[in-house]
């Protein structure tokens, strides 16, 4: 009996000395507690910590791409001086003041006010802090995307709703509209996708944002701005020309440039866009739009033949064939045969053919085509653009490397078939020497400049 009582006492002491288990970290508190990294008891409508510290308690849903952190606050003089120096070469329309940003976005705080009194307090505090030296900038393109998205998801300023149910329903509707919009075939419409569904907010359109903005992209942005400025006043018979260039051709190049080292270069892209703007006619631009609108692989060879028959200019043919190859690749045997015949007929390498040459080198194993490509690069006239000589040297290295690999494969096949490899080994040594010379030339002339 005594031992049993002692055991019960020891169990009670041990249980009382145990530390109560701590709760794990939660991710469902109000926004004020999340920002201050404190534990929220999630009381509604105001948690105890927000009530104690006088913070604005909000459980509203926020989309990450609508946050106010898309602008940069310049708090230090060093950052301000650097930004001021960089801004001298940029147009003034690319910057807006803090007060102007607030007026254009109708955005006062991260979450809606819980009462009219709270809204007036925030307005007064904003007005008192505006004249300080800390300013921030935002690009015009981001401002437009932000301004459009707020109205399309959360509703207008008077009927704005941040609740989870409203946002889930609205996003489902918009995404369904995007899917339906892509599936609809409308010959009169040149653009599909989210930008035709997430409509602009007409109340926020001002004279400062009336300039046409370039499509988002990689290194093509500066060239697109040049083209947009030059085409801002088009003739009446070429109204659809700008839509085709901006809505179709630029989009195709942007999504497919990463597999082509020529289209991925800003210098070549600038030249390419200027070439289209200055030399291509409205009829030919519409033909390019027809190539993009008709992705049927069976029509690729027909469009190829139509281009060769209608236009004799090698530059125009190169641009059209490049668009066909970008869209269809080497999945169409008839298109590949036509491309081979057309390329072998070329006696002079034009600068407009460079993206096509890059596609051919990366996708063909035909030695005749590679030899012809190497010969064209060796005899190219480097007068169309100052950057042409460097790209020519890079393509020369690429094609000789491709020839070296082709002869290595040939020798391996001959060894497996117990055939004589004397001639193949001679060819391999020759192209290895050519590759070494081309690489050394590029390294000495261009790599040292970088």
Curated annotation (Swiss-Prot):
Gene3D superfamilies in the cross-refs: Zn(2)-C6 fungal-type DNA-binding domain
InterPro entries (alphabetical): OAF3, Zn2-C6_fun-type_DNA-bd_sf, Zn2Cys6_DnaBD
Subcellular location field: Nucleus
GO biological process, one term: positive regulation of transcription by RNA polymerase II
One cellular component term from this protein's GO annotations in UniProt: nucleus
UniProt xrefs under CDD domains: GAL4
Keyword presence, Metal-binding: yes
Molecular functions per Gene Ontology: DNA-binding transcription factor activity, RNA polymerase II-specific; RNA polymerase II cis-regulatory region sequence-specific DNA binding; zinc ion binding
Region annotated Disordered, chain positions: 1-23, 210-234
Sequence ranges of Basic residues compositional bias: 1-12
Main location: nucleus
Domain of life per record: Eukaryota
Main function: Positive regulator of thiamine biosynthesis.
PANTHER family in the record: ARGININE METABOLISM REGULATION PROTEIN II, OLEATE-ACTIVATED TRANSCRIPTION FACTOR 1-RELATED
Protein's name in the database: Thiamine biosynthesis regulatory protein
Species this protein is from: Saccharomyces cerevisiae (strain ATCC 204508 / S288c)
Organism taxonomic ancestry: Eukaryota, Fungi, Dikarya, Ascomycota, Saccharomycotina
Gene this chain is encoded by: THI2
């Amino acid at each position: 009996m005594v031992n049993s009582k002692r055991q019960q006492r020891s169990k009670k002491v041990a249980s009382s000395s145990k530390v109560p288990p701590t709760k794990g970290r939660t991710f469902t508190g109000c926004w004020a507690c999340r920002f201050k990294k404190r534990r929220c008891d999630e009381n509604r409508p105001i948690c105890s910590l927000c009530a104690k510290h006088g913070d604005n308690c909000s459980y509203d849903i926020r989309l990450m791409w609508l946050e106010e952190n898309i602008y940069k606050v310049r708090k230090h003089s060093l950052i301000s001086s650097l930004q001021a120096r960089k801004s001298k070469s940029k147009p003034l329309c690319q910057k807006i003041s803090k007060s102007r940003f607030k007026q254009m976005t109708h955005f006062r705080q991260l979450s809606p006010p819980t009462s009219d009194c709270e809204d007036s307090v925030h307005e007064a505090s904003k007005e008192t802090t505006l004249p300080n030296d800390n300013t921030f900038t935002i690009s015009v393109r981001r401002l437009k995307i932000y301004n459009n998205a707020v109205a399309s998801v959360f509703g207008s300023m008077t009927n704005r709703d941040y609740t989870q149910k409203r946002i889930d329903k609205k996003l489902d509707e918009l995404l369904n509209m995007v899917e339906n919009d892509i599936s609809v075939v409308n010959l009169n419409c040149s653009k599909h996708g989210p930008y035709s569904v997430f409509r602009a907010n007409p109340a926020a359109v001002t004279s400062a944002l009336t300039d046409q903005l370039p499509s988002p992209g990689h290194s093509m942005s500066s060239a697109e701005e040049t083209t947009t400025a030059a085409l801002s006043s088009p003739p009446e018979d070429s109204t659809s020309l700008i839509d085709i260039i901006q809505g179709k051709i630029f989009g195709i190049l942007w999504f497919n440039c990463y597999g082509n080292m020529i289209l991925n270069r800003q210098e070549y892209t600038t030249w390419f866009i200027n070439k289209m703007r200055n030399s291509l006619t409205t009829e030919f631009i519409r033909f390019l739009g027809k190539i993009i609108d008709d992705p049927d692989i069976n029509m690729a060879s027909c469009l190829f033949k139509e281009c060769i028959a209608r236009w004799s200019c090698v530059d125009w043919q190169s641009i059209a064939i490049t668009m066909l190859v970008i869209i269809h690749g080497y999945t169409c045997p008839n298109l590949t045969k036509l491309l081979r015949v057309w390329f072998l007929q070329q006696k002079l390498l034009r600068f407009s053919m460079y993206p096509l040459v890059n596609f051919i080198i990366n996708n063909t194993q035909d030695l005749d085509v590679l030899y012809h490509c190497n010969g064209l690069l060796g005899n190219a006239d480097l007068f169309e653009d100052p950057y042409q000589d460097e790209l020519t040297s890079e393509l020369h290295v690429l094609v000789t490397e491709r020839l070296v690999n082709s002869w290595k494969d040939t020798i391996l096949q001959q060894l497996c078939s117990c055939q004589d490899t004397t001639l193949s080994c001679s060819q391999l040594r020759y192209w290895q020497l050519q590759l070494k010379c081309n690489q050394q030339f590029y390294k000495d002339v261009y790599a040292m400049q970088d």
